[in-house]
Amino acid sequence: MTSREDFLRRVRDALEALPNDERMVPVPRNYQRNAPVPSAEDQAEIVELFIDRLKHHGAQVHRVGADEIPGAIDSALRAHGARSALAPDGLPEHWLRRWELTGEHRVLDDQPHLSILDRERTDAVVTGCAGAVADAGTLILDGGPGQCRRDAAVLADCHICVVRVEQIDYSLPQVLDKLDPRRSITWFGGPTAMTDPEADSGKVGGVIEETERRLVVVIVG
């Protein structure tokens, strides 16, 4: 008998020696969930923590009012030198209108028929998000309105993500309660992206390539 087998045998023997009412120990699963709505002061601290974490990950962060979103997106796209941008279904049209109407700029709708090659050739993608985790500096996309599919988010050299203050929660458990588990969820927190080998026919099968990109987070509110 190996040391591992002996250890497991002793664990089984110890469990069998327990009274029936002590073998199953309930584990709480509602920690940090159903938290009360934070005060304005607490929410401000949560937002500042989120900004600090994003910057630590290497993201660029801009804080704007609701009417300043188009200008912030326009500035970010110009700073990146983008000539084309991918817009997911449900993204407010006016967010990109200012940038689209000046210069030779092109907005592509993120439709199912759009090929991987077309997505790769697009300079940037602009999205909203499903939620954000402040203590981890993590953004969450679930493919809902104004959010792109995972391959589009991963392949873009520049990702501009608009986050409303009320979408930022302190911890992951608080955000999980707001997500639809039936959706495909993408998590990211910085410029580094892991490309999906199944979505990129140009990569060697089974190889995941780490690529550097620009992440710009526009916080509204």
Language-model segments: which ranges?
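The feature marks the mature, well-folded catalytic cores of soluble enzymes
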Residues: 1-221
